[in-house]
Amino acid sequence: MGIDINHKYDRKVRRTEPKSQDVYLRLLVKLYRYLARRTGAKFNKIILKRLFMSKIYRPPISLSKVVRFMKKPGRELLTAVIVGTVTDDSRIFEIPKLSICALRVTQTARAGILKAGGEVITFDQLALRSPTGSKTVLLQGKRNAREAVKHFGPAPGVPHSHAKPLVRSKGRKFERARGRRRSCGYKK
């Protein structure tokens, strides 16, 4: 009698193509798959991998963050590359001249960049300009800034937990009575 081998762990799980059926995204994947294979540059492999990622791993980055990263010494003539969205930030008044390549740039962010004399290019333009990723800076937004992440971690109420409780409603009877005031049981 043979042994029934468990094949549960045989498969290596990773994306080899994007889940999205967006034809423009798939054209970019075709282009960067070719570049990653033919140039051997690590930059192209990273871009290709990020194009496969789901939306939660391609978080948006604000224009103010891009400005802050691009103000570092020696980055004046480099192109900021973001596999995701660049959003506007109304808190900044002066935008320096920037060269940005992103999957998507919001209308107001684009207007601000162009007004400052900068440029917004697409990934196919970047491939022509810099096929190996030279003179570029790869940036990405904060992955843990999502609202859902606030609920992760040790359960709310456990000592040293900073997890946000999942509350049905924000009324006075929800998470605001017992343990929060003397009149209802006790005050913590």
Curated annotation (Swiss-Prot):
InterPro entries: Ribosomal_eL18, Ribosomal_eL18/eL18-A/B/_CS, Ribosomal_uL15/eL18, Ribosomal_uL15/eL18_sf. One of its GO terms (biological process) is translation. SUPFAM superfamilies: Ribosomal proteins L15p and L18e (SSF52080). Signal peptide: none annotated. GO terms for cellular component: cytosolic large ribosomal subunit. Residues 169-188 are annotated as: Disordered. Residues 178-188 have a biased composition (Basic residues). Belongs to the eukaryotic ribosomal protein eL18 family. PANTHER family: 60S RIBOSOMAL PROTEIN L18, LARGE RIBOSOMAL SUBUNIT PROTEIN EL18. This is Large ribosomal subunit protein eL18. The gene is RpL18.
